[in-house]
């Protein structure tokens, strides 16, 4: 609900899971921005694939790096999951664990919030297909009122991505501006051209300042 770049019913994602014979679930994954980014990470738990929520991950693992300096656990969970029907049927009789997180609730800081997450189904199912995506194309979370991961940064990411769609399609755009293409006009940049741009500008294509 807080990801402005999410691809609804992504055909590549659906097709990837459908083409696997033994996998019954899949989840999109991005490289973490840094060790402090508040996203869960993909890891094996008791030899089964799963997600460790950021609030449950010990700091020593959060900061752990490889010899080249990259994060050891950098597969970030962006909460875009997909299940085959047989997987959902298996979960009908299962119960998911509770997680705790400190949040600001009704103006009260450091309140405890108890949550259940769908990703805890992965160890129960036993198989999960990680599907890597590019952050700039698919992950623009809105978690803060301002600063990083805010409405402003999400707006800018949409504008830059759609501007790139138009540029690749040959549209005569203003590179100093940002653009938003209606999903009724193009799902992921297909079907665009300079002719379409000129016809739809101000209608299904909006131009705005950074």
Where are these regions (language model features)?
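Short acidic donor-binding/metal-coordinating loop in glycosyltransferase active sites
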Residues: 1
């Amino acid at each position: 609900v807080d990801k402005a770049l999410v691809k609804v019913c992504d055909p590549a994602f659906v097709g990837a899971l459908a083409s696997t014979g033994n996998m019954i679930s899949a989840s999109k994954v991005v490289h973490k921005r840094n060790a402090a980014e508040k996203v869960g990470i993909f890891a094996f738990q008791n030899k089964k694939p799963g997600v460790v929520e950021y609030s449950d991950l010990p700091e020593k693992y959060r900061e752990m790096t490889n010899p080249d300096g990259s994060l050891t656990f950098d597969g970030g969970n962006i909460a875009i999951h997909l299940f085959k029907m047989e997987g959902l049927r298996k979960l009908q009789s299962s119960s998911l664990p509770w997680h705790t997180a400190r949040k600001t609730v009704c103006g009260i800081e450091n309140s405890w919030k108890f949550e259940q997450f769908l990703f805890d189904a992965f160890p129960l199912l036993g198989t999960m297909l990680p599907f890597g995506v590019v952050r700039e194309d698919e992950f623009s979370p809105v978690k803060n009122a301002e600063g990083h991961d805010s409405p402003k940064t999400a707006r800018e990411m949409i504008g830059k991505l759609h501007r790139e769609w138009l540029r690749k399609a040959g549209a005569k755009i203003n590179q100093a501006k940002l653009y938003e293409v209606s999903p009724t006009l193009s799902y992921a940049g297909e079907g665009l051209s300079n002719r379409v741009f000129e016809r739809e500008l101000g209608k299904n294509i909006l131009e705005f300042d950074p």
